[in-house]
From Swiss-Prot:
N-terminal signal peptide: 1-27
Name the UniProt record assigns to this protein: Glycoprotein UL1
Membrane topology note: Single-pass membrane protein
InterPro entries: Ig-like_dom_sf, Ig-like_fold
Keyword Signal tagged: yes
Transcription regulation listed as a keyword: no
Family, as annotated: Belongs to the RL11 family.
SUPFAM superfamilies registered for this protein in UniProt: Immunoglobulin
Organism: Human cytomegalovirus (strain Merlin) (HHV-5)
Major place of residence: virion
GO cellular component labels: membrane; viral envelope; virion membrane
Keyword set, alphabetical order: Late protein, Membrane, Signal, Transmembrane, Transmembrane helix, Viral envelope protein, Virion
Disulfide bonds: none
TM segment ranges: 178-198
Length: 218
């Protein structure tokens, strides 16, 4: 009876371990699942999902554009940054501080930096690059008088950065949840080891007692 009881307890412990392990796998934070940046190429459009924690700083560094390219950063129908190639130095550069996120336009690389992001800053940040049908060697006299900006209508590249900002409170709660499951799983594993040891020891004693009884009867 003792051997059968220990075997049942061992099977029960194994079953509990399997259940806890399945729960633990499902409790892995969403942030860990999406920490990698998966590129989804759709012709000239690129989508880059990024997940960060609240309070982080995000920096999008991109290479400079040729002289006959123009580029713009947009978020929620608001143009954050813009560079027009026909103007000299900063004359063709625009930065709209009335837009919602705290950001800085990186003039040297035509990039974008988001500061101390919050959950409200989650969304799509799009960088549009256009080819302009205007020669690069336009004279200085005409650089400030270019009116045919409509010639910059050929889209070369459009990159959508899909930003998800997770709450720090959510991250702490999730990490605590995972740590709890890890602790329970470790405890069950220890219990299984103890039960296995007890089961093997009891079985050996039972066999030895049976053998001794047989020897005595003979």
């Amino acid at each position: 009876m003792g051997v059968q009881c220990n075997s049942k307890l061992l099977l029960l412990a194994v079953l509990i371990t399997i259940i806890l392990s399945s729960i633990l796998v499902q409790a892995i934070p969403h942030k860990q699942k999406t920490s990698y940046q998966q590129l989804l190429l759709q012709s000239e459009h690129v989508q880059i999902p990024i997940t960060v924690a609240e309070g982080d700083t995000i920096c999008f560094n991109v290479s400079d554009n040729p002289c006959n390219f123009s580029s713009y950063w947009n978020h929620n129908n608001c143009e954050l940054c813009g560079w027009t190639p026909f103007y000299s130095e900063y004359a063709g550069y625009s930065e709209n501080k009335s837009c919602h996120p705290r950001f800085t336009c990186l003039h040297d690389t035509k990039g974008l930096k988001l500061h101390n992001v919050t959950t409200n800053d989650s969304g799509i940040y799009t960088r549009n690059v256009y080819y302009c049908d205007i020669p690069c060697n336009i004279s200085d006299d005409h650089k400030h008088n270019v009116e045919d900006f409509d010639n910059c209508n050929t889209t070369i590249n459009r990159t959508h950065y899909i930003i998800t900002v997770s709450s720090s409170r959510y991250s702490k709660r999730t990490n605590s949840h995972v740590a709890t499951h890890v602790g329970w799983t470790a405890t069950v594993v220890i219990i299984i080891c103890v039960l296995t040891y007890v089961n093997v020891t009891t079985t050996l004693k039972h066999r030895l007692r049976t053998r001794n009884n047989v020897n005595h009867t003979m």
